[in-house]
Amino acid sequence: VKKSLLGSILALAMAPLFAQVTVEDPWVRGTVPKQQATGAFMMLTAETDARLVAAESPVAGVVEIHEMAMENDVMKMREIPALDLPAGQTMELKPGGYHVMLMQLKEQMVGGTVVPITLIFEDSAGERFTQEIEARVTALGAAREGADKPMQHQHGHRH
């Protein structure tokens, strides 16, 4: 009994920590026909220090992590290599701030439809893990659907 218990304890101690990130309220801004880009927004909370390092979606040829920042009194959007997610703090990706940019869109983003997005995170040890989410498209000019509803929780998977 002692050997199997010790073996179990060692196996647990040696297992890599799973950097859990909770994704809440993911949504994508709707587009007009032939529009080539839009943003995806959500709230991210990591249990341990992590970083959002990339994202992918079948609806876009290019997906980048962006920030809005003031440069010479002008608000500019630019790509960033990663978004730090300090443990226990909620990072809001929102219009006018950090967001996931979907570019070279393959189709119009129509209100009420769902966009699959794969978020790629890295934990503090450099281990990458992914999380599949479904973000609902909010039509242009529409009030955000679900803004007053309970938040949806989605969890990631290590690869």
Kindly give the residue locations of the regions a language model identified:
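Compact, glycine-rich, soluble single-domain proteins
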Residues: Q20-H159
